[in-house]
């Protein structure tokens, strides 16, 4: 937060990307989550905008999987002379049904077979093994 707080004062071309996939390792709680959700729900138009409150310019993109829209957004800010936040909404596991339906399981993992999501090799990394054993 300190970096964001000072970014507006630098007067430099800084592009800050917030990849908002509405996800943490478990259920989301807290003020930052609520603020990002409100921005998503209002297509970035909420008057309660933590980034604007810090003096940062703010842009919202509701479909972070639209490559043309991403290129247009980045092109529009690449030469700007101040710090900007690009709040880009994405879907964790987009395009892989098994990943979209089980986001927590797919939050991190190892190599897998794209056809069915089964792991390649001996198994998942230690973090998966620990999570399942708890």
Per-region residue spans from a language model:
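Glycine-rich ThDP/TPP pyrophosphate-binding loop and its adjacent helix/strand module
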Residues: 1-133
């Amino acid at each position: 937060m300190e970096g964001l707080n000072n970014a507006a004062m630098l007067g430099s071309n800084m592009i800050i990307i917030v990849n908002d996939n509405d996800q943490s390792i478990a259920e989301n709680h807290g003020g930052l989550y609520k603020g990002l959700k409100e921005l998503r729900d209002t297509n970035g138009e909420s008057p309660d905008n933590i980034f604007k409150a810090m003096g940062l310019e703010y842009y919202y993109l509701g479909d972070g999987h639209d490559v043309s829209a991403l290129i247009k957004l980045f092109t529009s800010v690449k030469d700007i002379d101040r710090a900007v936040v690009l709040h880009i909404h994405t879907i964790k596991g987009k395009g892989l049904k098994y990943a979209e339906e089980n986001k927590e399981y797919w939050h991190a993992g190892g190599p897998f077979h794209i056809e069915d999501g089964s792991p390649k090799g001996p198994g998942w990394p230690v973090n998966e093994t620990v999570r399942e054993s708890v």
